[in-house]
Amino acid sequence: MIRELDLLQAGCIHVIEHNDQTINFAAQELVRYLEAITDCGIALKSAEQYDQREKGLWIGLPCDFPHSPFLVDEQEEYDDALWIDVSGGQGIISGVNPRSVLFSVYRFLNELGCRWVRPGADGEYLPKADIGSFTVRVYEHASYRYRGICIEGAVSLEHVTDMIDWMTKIGFNSYFIQFREAYFFFERWYNHLNNPLKLPSGDFNVEVARAYVALAKQEIQKRGMIYQAVGHGWTCAPFGIVGLSWEKWGDEVDPETSQFFALVNGKRELWQGIPINTDLCYSNSEARSKMIEEIVLYASLHPEVDLLHVWLSDGFNNQCECEQCVLMSPSDLYVRLMNELDEGLTALGIETRIVFLIYHELLWPPEYEKFINPDRFVMQFAPITRSYRQSFSTIEGVSDVPPFFRNKVDLPQTVEGNVSFLKAWQSRFKGDSFDFDYHFMWAHQRDPGYVHISRMVYEDIRHLHQIGLNGFVSCQVQRAFFPNGLGMTVMARTLWNKELSFREMAEDYYASAYGEDGPLCLKYAEELSELYFDLNLEKETDRNEVDRKSCFQNIYSLIRQFECVIEKNIHHANPCHAVSWRHLGIHAEIWTEMTRGLELLDRGEVEQALCIWEGVKTMVWKNEENCHRVFDVYNFVGVFDEIFSVKAL
């Protein structure tokens, strides 16, 4: 039934017609959630213009309402801001663009007590509420322009679409699909790589992957998100060599093609047999032209792409050593390529913006070449070799960039070392830029409590503006919610408002995810995280002296003592909380055994340690069906296979 006038017709939502799918979706989401939390029907009406005599909630753009706080003409295309002015369940929900209108709807629901602690319906915490009793007034601009996630890990279509759906609920505005078809990420899931207990699906192929990407794009577009695409593969696709992943190419390469490859150690061939790791002879104008033709063709066929990533190879110390290439730095040749690409796009009236990457050898800035049209480009800083035990907040100063020696580079390991390259680039490029980082690619697996890595991403994001960056795109596994989504929530909320308190966000998250025992759970996670930070699974050379034996014993004791709290809550009355506690129960079992294996490895009892690790793998393989929405088993096994293969901790 339609809710009657106890709220003075606040049970009606008016959406001002813009023929925009994102605004319409925002209105539908508001109706759906309000009906869930009020147990009443909510009417949805379309209107041509605002009429303050009509009671209820009004959804539209700032231009639809009198006295809008926005100066729309001054707003950058990708910047987000929201405006909510609701009193007694009536008023305005607006945003500076359609995407921001959707953010405003979710923010309004957040103020009513709704929370989304992980992707999927079982991650929704929806309290009962009477919207007529609420006054919500919010006027905010996002702290950073770029707030995104990049596909990585092993994924199903549902994992991806659930993630996209969840992202806008907490303030992310961009999604990046690597490669043209994201084949390898889907293949890892559908062929169950790293889980021998599951059989490959048998019907997965490249065409299926392309269909999945098309469906994911529909979800991105429905929400008005910034769509980023490709990155890898531009150095091989122009020559008919398919680069779907980091696997070796099985066919012969004819000399007409290999003449364009980088000359390394006297040979022009695929670098280590891997197409996407192979650089080209960038001083060769024909090689550049072939790349540019391929990129321009793709851009012309895909106008839906907002930010097109144009990267070189994913290898390093493999730059061309021919007599022409050695006269210029790799970055000088890269900027020359970018300028020629801009010329080609401009000639066809294509306005797609291009993301260029500073990474590996390209960390060293150009010496001579300059961007002719910097507004076309966005700089992506990718400090993949950095430590995740230090944040950008610890930087007191940066040193000069070391000299560049072709094919003899040592990549920086410290945060300061990486940022020194960023600063050098910023002296040559004054345009838009963001951090492309990897907190939840590998490092999160080494922090079972997730609190340290969550605080690290918080500190990094809070200080992005201090190192001249306007956002953050996280290259990461999509299922980084095990034991929970604290880190992902902190990432999104801090990107929206860098002044938020980590402690307050953590307390709110744990209360929303776990209920009344959330504070106990947070304390447990903090202690587990701190103990594993002391053990330091990242780098042996960076370890402090700690009593490792006591550390391991404290971990066992901590998990054992907390098991009774898990058991008490495993059948919690709230379905969202119950699922959170079930995940935590599986997590405790896994990490009890993981700790045994790591302790044995630390003591040098390698054979016994490997035996425990094999048992843990069997445990996670068997449990994958119960926690696959939150836990990337493929990634977990890969990270710890590497640690145990070293046969020392």
Question: Language-model segments: what does each one mean?
Answer:
Residues 503-522, 604-611, 617:
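Carbohydrate-binding surfaces of carbohydrate-active enzymes
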Residues 1-143:
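Contiguous, structured surface segment used for ligand recognition
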Residues 16-20, 38, 48-52, 63-69, ...:
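Aromatic-lined carbohydrate-binding surfaces of glycoside hydrolases
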Residues 541-649:
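Histidine-centered catalytic/metal-binding microenvironments
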Residues 44, 516-523, 577-578:
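Short, surface-exposed acidic
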